[in-house]
Amino acid sequence: MKSFRPISLTSFLLKTMERLIDRFIRDGTLVRYPLNKNQHAYLAGKSTDTALHNLVGRIERALNNKEYALGVFLDIEGAFNNASLASLLNVMRSKGVGDTVIRWIDFMLSNRIARANSGITNLEVCLWKGFPQGGVLSALMWILVADGLLELLKKTGHFLQGFADDFSILVEGIDLGTVCSVAQFAILQVERWCKEHGLSVNPRKTEMVLFTRKRKLDGFKPIQIFGEELQRSDQVKYLGVILDSKLTWQAHLTSKYNKAVSTFWQCKRIVGKTWGITPKIAHWIYVAIIRPMLSHAGMVAASRTGCCQNNAG
């Protein structure tokens, strides 16, 4: 049932009202009380590129200093469906949002009914938590809630980065035992925050990578989240980019190269010498489909793009 999400059908007038409130909060409240700088989703000037640049920059600095960098990549389970309305309203009050806006959002989210028709019977359920899927305000409401977690880890001196409902903890240090202990404490803070806000993290979808160029891993300690031990991986796919433990970019570039070649040959099947699409359309396919595959997050892997040029040649 987790795969089924209710479609939020709202009128043009309501969408317009949501857009006005969204702009009012962004241009007013968030200017006076800005969100944590480590949130990279749904904000002007932020994107997957800025998130990757920020995270990879810290990892590269740790490797250059011959330190360990332990990354734990978390996914908040059903974030938009399970977010607490009370948590949102508390955050909005702390940010100084006006009472009128808070009451309007409270009324909008508290009076929702989901209807399902199985062909045999109809079912109606009152929704008392979560944000409407596809709603104009939903993205802003979630990053307001998630800002509390980012600020909590900031106060305890830990690095936590967010992109929508994807979070990454990164702990750097010269002593591996200390790095593991600090990471475990950070995870405990995440667990506590999730319990307070009615959310959870799926341990099976949580990935842990130890970034290092050292061969010996003396002092490594097992790390748990919600009672389950995390398994250490050699690589992780984060925001569409494969980060390997030594940050060689080999796995990522090979994956992108193979995908681009496969897509190219699929497109080539619809082109012939005397039939098919025109050269102009073929060029458009390359520019619109193939090139974005290769250029995504290209700046973070710039040091290793030479191997792509060799393969292309």
Kindly label every feature range from the protein language model:
Residues 1-132, 140, 171:
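Conserved pre-catalytic core of RNA-dependent polymerases
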Residues 5-6, 39, 43, 69-79, ...:
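Catalytic palm active-site di-aspartate
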Residues 60-61, 114-115, 151-155, 266-269, ...:
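Conserved helix-loop functional segments at active or binding sites
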Residues 66-70, 202-207, 276-286:
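Short amphipathic alpha-helical interface segments
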Residues 76-95, 130, 168-195, 213, ...:
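Catalytic palm subdomain of template-directed nucleic-acid polymerases
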Residues 119, 185-188, 199-234:
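Short, conserved micro-motifs composed of acidic
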Residues 166, 202-214, 284, 307, ...:
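A glycine-rich phosphate-binding loop feature that marks nucleotide/adenosyl-phosphate handling sites
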Residues 227-301:
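Basic, alpha-helical interaction scaffolds
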